[in-house]
Design a protein with these regions (language model features):
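Metal-centered catalytic cores of metalloenzymes
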Residues: 2-6, 14-18, 22-80, 84-146
Length: 146
């Protein structure tokens, strides 16, 4: 009888431990990138600017963390945003604005809704950087899972 009680206690503790850590075991970090080019704007922009977005999305915390480097813009960045949902040939509204405009690199983070995370994972977001000379956007790239 003591052996049964001991085994039951050990099994209960084991199951409780597994359940306590189960959500963390299903979490994942996803990596995203976008190559930013003037030719990718809709409509295309005649410019020499280019850049690269790298981002990670933590599925447990729903936090998107990003860094954007850019060079050869026609002027300083005036604004930058994640837009969606849209394919590479369409425009869409802002879903995540960059809060602090600085020189390259731009860095930030945002907490996404489930719908935003689904659009991001489906490749329906793009990122672009705006300047005074190109108010609609000077460089753009479709954000894709790596």
């Amino acid at each position: 009888m003591k052996t049964f009680a001991l085994r039951s206690t050990i099994a209960s503790v084991g199951i409780a431990t597994l359940l306590a850590f189960a959500p963390a075991s299903f979490a994942a970090t996803e990596t995203y990138t976008a190559e930013l080019k003037s030719a990718s704007e809709v409509p295309p922009v005649d410019g020499k600017g280019s850049g690269m977005l790298t981002a990670t999305y933590d599925t447990a915390t729903k936090k998107l963390t990003y860094s954007v480097t850019f060079k050869d813009l026609s002027g300083p960045p005036a604004a930058a945003h994640f837009h969606g949902p849209a394919d590479a040939k369409s425009n869409a509204g802002v879903v995540v604005p960059v809060k602090e405009m600085t020189a390259s690199p731009l860095k930030g983070e945002a907490t996404l809704t489930d719908a935003q995370a689904a659009d991001l994972a489906a490749g329906k977001w793009y990122f672009n950087v705006h300047t005074a000379n190109n108010k609609g956007g000077e460089i753009r790239g479709q954000v894709m899972k790596k």
